[in-house]
Amino acid sequence: MTIDTHCHYDMMENPTDYISKAESHGDIIIGMTNLPSHYRMGKAHVVGYKHIRLSLGFHPQLAATSQHELPMFDTLINFTSYIGEIGLDFSSAYSNSKDIQIKSLRHILSKISGDTHKLVSVHSRKAEKELLALLLEYRIPNVIFHWYSGSISLITNIVSAGYYFSVNEAMTKSANGRKILSTIPKERILTESDAPYNKHYNIRNTLEYLNMSEYEIYQNFRCLINRMKY
Protein backbone atom coordinates (compact mmCIF):
# COMPACT_ATOMS: atom_id res chain seq x y z
CA MET A 1 0.00 0.00 0.00
CA THR A 2 1.35 3.39 -0.99
CA ILE A 3 0.02 6.79 0.01
CA ASP A 4 -0.06 9.56 -2.58
CA THR A 5 -1.21 12.81 -1.00
CA HIS A 6 -0.79 14.95 -4.12
CA CYS A 7 -1.70 13.55 -7.54
CA HIS A 8 -3.41 15.14 -10.52
CA TYR A 9 -5.08 11.96 -11.72
CA ASP A 10 -7.76 13.99 -13.48
CA MET A 11 -4.99 15.00 -15.91
CA MET A 12 -3.94 11.40 -16.61
CA GLU A 13 -4.51 9.90 -20.04
CA ASN A 14 -6.97 7.44 -18.48
CA PRO A 15 -7.96 8.65 -14.99
CA THR A 16 -10.50 5.91 -14.35
CA ASP A 17 -8.03 3.16 -15.14
CA TYR A 18 -5.37 4.82 -12.97
CA ILE A 19 -7.51 5.14 -9.86
CA SER A 20 -9.17 1.74 -10.35
CA LYS A 21 -5.77 0.03 -10.33
CA ALA A 22 -4.73 2.01 -7.26
CA GLU A 23 -7.93 1.07 -5.46
CA SER A 24 -7.44 -2.61 -6.28
CA HIS A 25 -3.96 -2.46 -4.73
CA GLY A 26 -5.25 -0.74 -1.60
CA ASP A 27 -3.31 2.43 -2.39
CA ILE A 28 -4.52 5.76 -1.01
CA ILE A 29 -4.63 8.74 -3.38
CA ILE A 30 -5.72 12.29 -2.71
CA GLY A 31 -6.30 13.85 -6.09
CA MET A 32 -5.78 17.54 -6.72
CA THR A 33 -7.68 19.79 -9.10
CA ASN A 34 -6.50 23.06 -10.59
CA LEU A 35 -9.89 24.77 -10.76
CA PRO A 36 -13.37 24.36 -9.26
CA SER A 37 -14.78 23.43 -12.67
CA HIS A 38 -12.33 20.52 -12.81
CA TYR A 39 -13.51 19.32 -9.40
CA ARG A 40 -17.13 19.60 -10.49
CA MET A 41 -16.43 17.49 -13.58
CA GLY A 42 -14.43 14.87 -11.73
CA LYS A 43 -16.29 14.38 -8.47
CA ALA A 44 -18.89 11.94 -9.80
CA HIS A 45 -16.15 9.66 -11.12
CA VAL A 46 -14.69 8.93 -7.66
CA VAL A 47 -17.95 8.20 -5.86
CA GLY A 48 -17.82 4.69 -4.40
CA TYR A 49 -14.06 4.45 -4.07
CA LYS A 50 -12.82 3.62 -0.58
CA HIS A 51 -9.25 4.93 -0.86
CA ILE A 52 -9.50 7.62 -3.54
CA ARG A 53 -10.42 11.24 -2.84
CA LEU A 54 -10.68 14.38 -4.96
CA SER A 55 -9.78 17.85 -3.71
CA LEU A 56 -11.29 21.20 -4.61
CA GLY A 57 -8.58 23.43 -6.04
CA PHE A 58 -7.75 26.90 -7.32
CA HIS A 59 -4.18 26.85 -8.60
CA PRO A 60 -2.25 30.09 -8.06
CA GLN A 61 -0.81 29.93 -11.57
CA LEU A 62 -4.36 30.26 -12.92
CA ALA A 63 -5.55 32.98 -10.55
CA ALA A 64 -5.16 35.85 -13.02
CA THR A 65 -7.35 34.20 -15.66
CA SER A 66 -9.86 32.34 -13.48
CA GLN A 67 -11.45 34.86 -11.12
CA HIS A 68 -14.85 33.91 -12.49
CA GLU A 69 -14.44 30.47 -10.86
CA LEU A 70 -14.21 31.73 -7.27
CA PRO A 71 -18.01 31.79 -6.75
CA MET A 72 -18.06 28.15 -7.84
CA PHE A 73 -15.35 27.40 -5.27
CA ASP A 74 -17.57 28.96 -2.60
CA THR A 75 -20.47 26.73 -3.62
CA LEU A 76 -18.51 23.49 -3.80
CA ILE A 77 -16.49 23.93 -0.63
CA ASN A 78 -19.30 22.48 1.48
CA PHE A 79 -19.17 19.19 -0.45
CA THR A 80 -15.61 18.12 0.32
CA SER A 81 -13.13 17.83 3.17
CA TYR A 82 -10.17 18.08 0.80
CA ILE A 83 -8.81 21.36 -0.57
CA GLY A 84 -6.01 21.57 -3.13
CA GLU A 85 -4.18 22.61 -5.01
CA ILE A 86 -4.19 26.14 -3.66
CA GLY A 87 -1.43 28.53 -2.62
CA LEU A 88 0.98 31.08 -4.05
CA ASP A 89 3.56 31.06 -6.84
CA PHE A 90 5.94 34.02 -6.98
CA SER A 91 8.37 32.46 -9.46
CA SER A 92 9.37 34.70 -12.36
CA ALA A 93 6.69 33.40 -14.71
CA TYR A 94 3.88 34.29 -12.27
CA SER A 95 5.25 37.14 -10.16
CA ASN A 96 3.22 39.68 -12.15
CA SER A 97 0.02 38.12 -10.76
CA LYS A 98 1.22 38.26 -7.15
CA ASP A 99 -1.50 40.66 -5.96
CA ILE A 100 -4.40 38.75 -7.46
CA GLN A 101 -2.96 35.48 -6.17
CA ILE A 102 -2.89 36.86 -2.64
CA LYS A 103 -6.39 38.29 -2.99
CA SER A 104 -7.71 34.95 -4.27
CA LEU A 105 -5.99 32.97 -1.54
CA ARG A 106 -7.29 35.28 1.16
CA HIS A 107 -10.79 34.72 -0.21
CA ILE A 108 -10.35 30.94 -0.09
CA LEU A 109 -8.74 30.84 3.35
CA SER A 110 -11.48 33.03 4.78
CA LYS A 111 -13.96 30.28 3.85
CA ILE A 112 -12.09 27.60 5.80
CA SER A 113 -10.61 29.65 8.63
CA GLY A 114 -10.32 27.50 11.74
CA ASP A 115 -12.05 24.55 10.05
CA THR A 116 -10.56 21.38 11.53
CA HIS A 117 -12.49 19.19 9.08
CA LYS A 118 -10.57 20.33 5.99
CA LEU A 119 -7.23 18.98 4.75
CA VAL A 120 -5.35 21.47 2.57
CA SER A 121 -2.53 20.82 0.09
CA VAL A 122 -0.57 23.95 -0.79
CA HIS A 123 1.72 25.14 -3.58
CA SER A 124 4.36 27.52 -2.26
CA ARG A 125 7.00 28.14 -4.94
CA LYS A 126 9.11 31.21 -4.16
CA ALA A 127 6.37 32.32 -1.73
CA GLU A 128 6.87 30.01 1.23
CA LYS A 129 7.18 32.70 3.89
CA GLU A 130 4.19 34.68 2.63
CA LEU A 131 2.05 31.57 2.36
CA LEU A 132 2.89 30.38 5.87
CA ALA A 133 2.00 33.82 7.25
CA LEU A 134 -1.42 33.69 5.58
CA LEU A 135 -2.12 30.14 6.77
CA LEU A 136 -1.37 31.21 10.33
CA GLU A 137 -3.36 34.43 10.00
CA TYR A 138 -6.45 32.48 8.94
CA ARG A 139 -5.84 29.68 11.48
CA ILE A 140 -5.75 26.85 8.94
CA PRO A 141 -5.02 23.76 11.05
CA ASN A 142 -4.40 20.86 8.63
CA VAL A 143 -1.92 21.68 5.89
CA ILE A 144 0.44 19.72 3.65
CA PHE A 145 3.23 21.66 1.95
CA HIS A 146 3.52 19.98 -1.45
CA TRP A 147 7.00 19.63 -3.04
CA TYR A 148 8.59 22.19 -0.73
CA SER A 149 11.60 23.94 -2.29
CA GLY A 150 12.01 26.93 0.01
CA SER A 151 14.55 27.89 2.63
CA ILE A 152 15.81 25.33 5.12
CA SER A 153 15.36 27.79 7.98
CA LEU A 154 11.61 28.08 7.39
CA ILE A 155 11.05 24.34 7.82
CA THR A 156 11.20 24.72 11.60
CA ASN A 157 8.42 27.31 11.49
CA ILE A 158 6.26 25.12 9.28
CA VAL A 159 6.75 22.16 11.62
CA SER A 160 6.00 24.35 14.65
CA ALA A 161 2.70 25.28 13.02
CA GLY A 162 1.79 21.58 12.99
CA TYR A 163 2.04 21.22 9.24
CA TYR A 164 3.28 18.34 7.09
CA PHE A 165 5.34 17.99 3.90
CA SER A 166 4.55 15.75 0.93
CA VAL A 167 7.74 14.69 -0.82
CA ASN A 168 8.46 12.96 -4.12
CA GLU A 169 11.15 11.13 -6.05
CA ALA A 170 12.27 14.24 -7.95
CA MET A 171 13.33 15.80 -4.64
CA THR A 172 15.75 12.93 -4.07
CA LYS A 173 17.55 13.78 -7.31
CA SER A 174 18.65 17.35 -6.55
CA ALA A 175 21.11 18.66 -3.97
CA ASN A 176 18.59 21.16 -2.61
CA GLY A 177 15.85 18.54 -2.48
CA ARG A 178 18.07 16.12 -0.57
CA LYS A 179 19.04 18.84 1.90
CA ILE A 180 15.37 19.62 2.49
CA LEU A 181 14.55 15.93 2.95
CA SER A 182 17.30 15.58 5.54
CA THR A 183 15.87 18.50 7.53
CA ILE A 184 12.18 17.57 7.70
CA PRO A 185 11.35 15.47 10.80
CA LYS A 186 10.35 11.98 9.69
CA GLU A 187 7.09 12.17 11.60
CA ARG A 188 6.02 15.06 9.34
CA ILE A 189 6.79 13.39 6.03
CA LEU A 190 4.11 12.18 3.63
CA THR A 191 4.62 10.87 0.11
CA GLU A 192 3.30 12.22 -3.17
CA SER A 193 3.68 11.67 -6.90
CA ASP A 194 2.51 14.99 -8.39
CA ALA A 195 1.79 12.89 -11.45
CA PRO A 196 1.49 13.43 -14.33
CA TYR A 197 3.37 16.76 -14.10
CA ASN A 198 6.30 15.20 -12.26
CA LYS A 199 8.11 12.64 -14.40
CA HIS A 200 9.94 11.12 -11.41
CA TYR A 201 7.07 9.95 -9.26
CA ASN A 202 7.84 6.42 -8.07
CA ILE A 203 6.78 6.52 -4.42
CA ARG A 204 8.64 3.34 -3.51
CA ASN A 205 11.88 4.88 -4.77
CA THR A 206 11.18 7.85 -2.52
CA LEU A 207 10.62 5.56 0.46
CA GLU A 208 13.85 3.70 -0.26
CA TYR A 209 15.80 6.97 -0.31
CA LEU A 210 14.17 8.11 2.94
CA ASN A 211 14.73 4.72 4.56
CA MET A 212 11.09 4.77 5.59
CA SER A 213 8.41 2.12 5.26
CA GLU A 214 4.92 2.40 3.83
CA TYR A 215 3.65 1.75 7.34
CA GLU A 216 5.56 4.74 8.75
CA ILE A 217 4.03 7.00 6.12
CA TYR A 218 0.62 5.51 6.87
CA GLN A 219 1.06 6.29 10.57
CA ASN A 220 1.94 9.91 9.75
CA PHE A 221 -1.07 10.11 7.46
CA ARG A 222 -3.39 8.68 10.11
CA CYS A 223 -2.16 11.22 12.66
CA LEU A 224 -3.09 14.01 10.27
CA ILE A 225 -6.43 12.52 9.22
CA ASN A 226 -7.40 11.93 12.85
CA ARG A 227 -7.23 15.67 13.44
CA MET A 228 -10.10 16.09 10.99
CA LYS A 229 -12.44 14.12 13.24
CA TYR A 230 -12.47 16.62 16.07
Named regions from a protein language model:
Residues M1-Y230:
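Mid-domain alpha/beta scaffold segments of enzyme catalytic cores
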